[in-house]
Amino acid sequence: MSSILNILPALAFLLILLSISAYIQRTSKENRQKDFAKDYFIGGRTLGGFVLAMTTAATYSSVSTFVGGPGVAWVIGYGWLYMAIVQVVVIFLVLGVFGKKIALIAREIDAVTVIDVLRARYHSDFLANMAAVVIVAFFCATMVAQFVGAAKLFEAVTDFSYLTGLTMFGLIVVIYTTIGGFKGVAVTDACCAIAMIVGLCILMGGMMHAGGGFNKIMSYISTQHPDMLEPLSRGKMPISLYISQWLLVGICTLSLPQSVVRGISYKDTKALHNAMIIGTVVIGAMTLVATWIGVISKGILTGPITAYGNSVDNIMPIAIVQSLTPFWAGVIIIGPIAATISTVSSLLLSSSSSIVKDVYMNIKGKREEQLSNNQIRLYSLGATIILGLLVYAIAIKPPSVIWQINMFAFGGLETAFFWVLIFGLFWPKANKYGAIAAMGGGVIIYCLAMVFKIKVLDLHQIVLGIGLSLLCFFIGNSFGKTVDEKTLRIFFPEKFDDEK
């Protein structure tokens, strides 16, 4: 009986999200009858600043925010926290660099997805289809890993099995994403972001109490592990790791399609500006507090890593169990579950839009076979359900290499879209051959570098992927011509202002 009571907070939270999504489905019925694709995939471009900020922050945060990151901080110390500071500017970068421009372009060409924008800019179905394949492949790998990570944490903190946790939040997120669409995902993401912040605050209080207070914890760390107070952690946090992580989880994240699409969905400039401010504060609070909790947990889990299963992923689950009562541990589990489902819901919706909107509807359009609004609705809902259930099924018995595959995802998406978006939106001379070479060549190079553990100057493979992707872009671009003037007027209207 007590075990059931321990998971009631998490179950109640999931049911609230499901109810919100069902409510949004009902209130959006009229808009979906007019243009289902626009309302379902980007919420009809009606997001306000607060929801835009929270959904972007929640999408960026994942189960690693609660498990992997703090676990590494337990080993390295404040050096990992200093590295994590770069993540504070992530939302400011995404919305600041791409937000306004991509919103104006999307309204001009009636784009619903990032791939719509790329297709209109480069006039290449091959590039658009390649982008769709990249998105679906990497997103599915990420979603499986998110499910696996959260379910394992659920199993460690509660008395319930891995499958129970996976089923409880896995199926609910598939259902509420399917019925709520983008607007439902955005609003529930906002709820998830709030839940994550509250969970981190409770966990921080529990950690401090269990460790005897901040002064006692820091006294132990400074005496027993003084290296944890140093920026380089006596070699465990080299400069090359700082540079690699600042690129991987900082600068290059501005090109992640699941974040960029948020720039298509807001209602006005005021919402964008508010989101940049609110989002920066929220992502900063979540990332830095979570990482700091990992550092101070060293004062609670004082044994060697071999005492905790020889894995940093076990640190936070064990710390939660040792720091909190079963009930509060059940409340805390809402945080990582919220981080998981907010990420999965966004990736799931983006994946289904890539299949239905970017590939299938485009093929039909080329054949002059227009789909009815009802057909679009059925195909979109069907794709979301099928993808979601597929990810859930794989997560039940995940392949042993899934964590290695997940490592590809973040850097792979950045390598694929970084230069394609940057040059596409800010360099008039960029053409489809450069974009195809950068995306295809960059992803292949990055994946090969990851598989064979190839590094340059001990930097993460993202540096090699991004660097050679840039080279591929320039080489490919030299074989093509600049796009037509009509396209340039849409994407670079400032170049033609003198003619008015």
Summary of predicted features, one role per range:
Residues 1-500:
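Membrane-embedded helix-loop-helix hairpins and adjacent transmembrane boundary segments
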